[in-house]
Amino acid sequence: TERNSLPLTMLFSLFPGGGHFYSEHYVRGGFILAAEVALTYEVFINKPYQQDRRFKQARPYRDSVGKYTEAMLNTTSPEELSLLRTKRDRYANLVRGFSDKKMEEEDLRKAEMAWLIGLHVYNVFDAFGIWMNNRGHSVEQRSMGKALAFALIPGGGQIYNRDFGKAGLLYMGLIGAFTSIGTTQHLIEYYLERRRVIRGEKNFEEEERLSERITHYRKNRNQYIWGGAIIYLYSIGDAIVDALLSDFDNPLHFAIAPSFEGGLQASVGIDF
């Protein structure tokens, strides 16, 4: 492509897929644009709408909790007090369920926001990598030792090998993984506190449900930890292999063409 201006590439890369469209990489640019638009809609439109909807759904139950609590304060009958407490607790559990769901959706929104940011980081790095490759691809042998040293810094090995698109993918994965670790840990702590409070109420069914949520999010957190570690270790191996094979990228020319020397005949040429 003749569109090889660095300032314009970087300027357009501020927009989803812009640098790719500018450099005529339309398929990749279209994929990035579609993914960023979908995540933007989910983070800024759908999630707030869902939270507002749940808040409205919980309002009648919250009002009922207040009504039965007030009635409990105004009664002196033990039988009526027990009945009112049972009704209040039932509505209180419904309100807690809405609160739990809202907390989960908010933490999911934060994780999706991180993936959106990571995707845009990849968008910028990959656009810059396209610009670098358009200027000519280096086929010099790179040092494996230097590649390993740089690879200890996340993305450093890929940048050393001038694989900027891979560096962007690495940063996207690490940003998403470590943010998801933080959000799931926040939910674990939230449910641990909920379980601690509920134990004083002798509500064994609710306590069991909370324990299941704690186990579920601990498993998710551990998966993200392992995922982040695997991505990092893979980036180190990838940097070393790319450095080892860096001088293998010399173009091998293979051509089949007619030859008119000594009569019409086919010829095969291999240029090392």
Predicted segments — roles?
Residues Y49-S64:
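Active-site-surrounding "flap" and adjacent substrate/cofactor-binding loops of secreted or lumenal enzymes
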Residues E42-Q50, I181-L187:
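Short, solvent-exposed beta-strand-terminating loops
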Residues R28-G30, V37-F44:
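Glycine- and aromatic-enriched membrane insertion/assembly motifs of diderm outer-membrane
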